[in-house]
């Protein structure tokens, strides 16, 4: 451990020495119409040929020598903004980008995309915009995020009628799927034909297929990171749509103009409503709700409360019913310690429920997983050549393997509860993104995590502590 600390010290020492003679420009980049912060906006200093990108909350920071510079900010679907700025001291500068109304001509993708990827140490990462997803062919007129990422290289379908995906040979349960930092355990609606993500409420999608940053843990194949919209803090808007399978409605607007906002987006299928008009008592439907509240306390502090709730229900003749779905909530606090140090504190709750009712036998069965997660992440812009990402994470797991209860007094089922399992998973990480020369950049990091089983458990032992032996003649122990 001391050896690693020494290596890190000598690698970062030049950055600290040279950064003393420089100043920093930092700020937030947002949409002019809605004040929605924009993720992944390119901020480029033309005179120095250096630049950076906004983080998950629209924040950027660049350290550079004193002088006059032309700052270019660009983002797909928005007009590029160019502004000349004199920088003689640390400056906070926010930018607002206007959505581009110009109709784009046919775009031909060339090898330049690979050249751009080589320039960044972040490899095997794909980013999709919501507009791109909505332009793709849709099943029964329903846009689908999971189906869209199947078009990316290295991503395949988990199977017919399933909404999961495999990345480079990994299993579907080896993918970490996050919605506003909260874990989504089941991404499917309606037997896998649709995913649980309402694209009307989504702001940013990023898929890590390799070189996964050390701030993520718990999975080995990939990370699908999804962020919801914050809501329009300027004006009230509503939009929706009616499809063959489901309908949707979104409402967003200011709580306090230019300071706080809300967003509510709901979807529901309605095929089961028509089945009630016939003698058919079968039913299959889903619904979900996305919510988000955002509030700007001051220039250095922001609060976010986001949530998702979804359910799928399938029943046959009122004698069989299957119910499952996700529930997640996240309370976040963004704090800017300085123009170089950004932090985010998150309190996260994730829940997956699975229920089964068999009235002809007379029992209810339910199981599920609950997580309580505390995260504290920091992003430190040490210099124009070095960025540090570090933080801690603590997860409390509550596993319910199964609980069975009789549905009526004539049922022959006795109530029973399989022993619940509990665990605690703390972790800490550090990531370094460093530009060594104009042609060489590296990204390296380390993550430390532990998994603790909690609570009592019944352990069976053999009489007299005799060792277990195997009899090959009778194939018994």
Q: Where are the model-predicted features located?
A:
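Signature of Gram-negative outer-membrane beta-barrel scaffolds
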Residues: 394-477
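Periplasmic N-terminal accessory/gating domains of Gram-negative outer-membrane beta-barrel systems
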Residues: 108-115, 119-212, 223, 229
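Transmembrane beta-barrel wall of Gram-negative outer-membrane proteins
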Residues: 24, 243-270, 279-313, 321-345, ...
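Extracellular loop and loop/strand-boundary signature of outer-membrane beta-barrel proteins
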Residues: 235-237, 274-280, 314-320, 328-332, ...
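Periplasm-facing N-terminal accessory domains of Gram-negative outer-membrane beta-barrel systems
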Residues: 19-106, 439
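Short strand-turn segments of transmembrane beta-barrel domains in outer membranes
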Residues: 192-195, 203-214, 222-253, 261-285, ...
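N-terminal secretion/transport leader regions
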Residues: 26, 30, 38-46, 72-76, ...
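Outer-membrane beta-barrel translocator domains and adjoining extracellular loop/strand segments
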Residues: 275-280, 307-310, 314-322, 355-363, ...
